[in-house]
């Protein structure tokens, strides 16, 4: 399976025109995507294989008295592409971006019954 993992930057909106089923919770609005990508400290990694088949969104939380932290907001992979290590690759790429931005910690949360996410 040939999947490209890459960060989205402002102006990359066209890459998100084709999105596989169940990658995001709701339909992606172009205005929200543009605002998200333009916001300082907001980062998005996508998995591309004939369109977006996975996404990982994170925000940097900066503190006055301690090291910055990376908060992973969302991770989603289309069911047709799950169990191929895509989520792990996106998380690893996001952790690397966090380190580059000076984050000393990363936080990832999920629901107790989300067995696939807990396996990461």
Annotate each PLM feature.
Residues 51-60, 71, 76:
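Conserved beta-strand in the GNAT
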């Amino acid at each position: 399976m040939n999947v490209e993992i890459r960060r989205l930057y402002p102006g990359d909106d066209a890459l998100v025109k084709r999105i596989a089923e169940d990658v995001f919770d709701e339909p992606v609005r172009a205005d929200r995507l543009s605002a998200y990508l333009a916001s300082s400290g907001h980062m998005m990694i996508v998995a591309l294989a004939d369109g977006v088949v996975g996404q990982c969104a994170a925000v940097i939380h900066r503190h006055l008295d301690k090291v910055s932290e990376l908060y992973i907001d969302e991770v989603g992979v289309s069911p047709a592409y799950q169990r191929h290590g895509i989520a792990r690759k996106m998380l690893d790429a996001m952790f690397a971006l966090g380190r580059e931005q000076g984050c000393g910690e990363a936080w990832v949360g999920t629901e107790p019954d989300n067995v696939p996410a807990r396996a990461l």
